[in-house]
């Protein structure tokens, strides 16, 4: 891998991780195109580069993670965030690890993963249309309204993102939007989970491929991905804070559909 390829991979990871398109799939595609990597190695490389997203989330949401630490000491708000992380992680681990093993063994799963993203995207757009027509207060939930059931659903949704073609941020943000959360709260609640899911993905990739993914060039791509991620997070959260709730839902849904269709076309 040369320096230019590392830059391309870093930019792809830094942008696609936070959008409703699968960063793993985009990195896989670029890796196979520029490096002629095998599907298995490209898949593991896509997972390993999520370490860049982990660092970006830890930096950008450092105050939230400090609250989580205070949750161990009894802080009420921190305890809510701590519970959220524990419940979603447990649900993700219970379902995600077996799915990862299956994906590695039967790589790739074809167009089915893409169809799931298309269906979710259509659901979000349909939900946005209903909210606009009803002019109700739905879609205004904040993190304080999060229930254990909602946490578990987010964790289960996140587990599906180990499959090629399914975006972690896309499927978790979509789930939260469908549950009626404000767009900025949905994005934030999704992004805060990146370190847990990302560390797990990076560890699985390293244990699977070892030195093949932990090269100096890949580390360079990771650092570039970190910088691009910080810029992307800020831009997305500013957009989500706008009063155009319906527009945010439609944009997220459209990107999810586009990502799903891309996956279907690549599988055909």
From Swiss-Prot:
EC number(s) recorded for this UniProt protein: 3.6.1.27
TM stretches of this protein: 41-61, 81-101, 106-126, 146-166, 191-211, 213-233, 245-265
Coiled-coil portions: none
Cellular localization per UniProt: Cell membrane
Catalytically driven reaction(s): di-trans,octa-cis-undecaprenyl diphosphate + H2O = di-trans,octa-cis-undecaprenyl phosphate + phosphate + H(+)
A Pfam family annotated for this UniProt entry: BacA
The protein's name: Undecaprenyl-diphosphatase
Source species of the chain: Pyrobaculum islandicum (strain DSM 4184 / JCM 9189 / GEO3)
Name of the gene encoding the protein in the UniProt record: uppP
């Amino acid at each position: 891998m040369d320096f230019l390829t590392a830059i391309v991979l870093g930019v792809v990871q830094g942008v696609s991780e936070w959008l409703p398109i699968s960063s793993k799939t985009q990195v896989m595609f670029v890796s196979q195109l520029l490096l002629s990597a095998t599907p298995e190695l490209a898949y593991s490389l896509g997972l390993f580069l999520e370490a860049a997203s982990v660092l970006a989330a830890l930096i950008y949401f450092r105050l939230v993670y400090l609250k989580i630490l205070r949750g161990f000491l009894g802080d009420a708000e921190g305890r809510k965030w701590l519970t959220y992380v524990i419940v979603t992680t447990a649900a993700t681990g219970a379902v995600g690890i077996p799915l990862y093993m299956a994906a590695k063994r039967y790589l790739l799963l074809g167009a089915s993963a893409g169809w799931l993203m298309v269906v979710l995207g259509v659901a979000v757009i349909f939900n946005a249309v209903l909210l606009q027509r009803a002019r109700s207060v739905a879609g205004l939930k904040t993190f304080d309204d999060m229930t254990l059931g909602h946490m578990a659903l987010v964790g289960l949704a996140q587990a599906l993102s180990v499959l090629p073609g399914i975006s972690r941020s896309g499927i978790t943000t979509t789930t939260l939007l469908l549950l009626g959360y404000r767009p900025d709260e949905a994005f934030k609640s999704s992004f805060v989970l990146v370190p847990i899911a990302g560390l797990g993905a990076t560890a699985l990739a390293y244990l699977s491929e070892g030195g093949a993914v932990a090269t100096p060039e890949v580390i360079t791509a990771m650092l570039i991905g970190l910088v691009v991620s910080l810029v992307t997070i800020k831009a997305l959260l500013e957009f989500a804070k706008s009063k155009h709730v319906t527009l945010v839902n439609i944009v997220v849904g459209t990107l999810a559909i586009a990502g799903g269709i891309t996956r279907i076309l690549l599988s055909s």
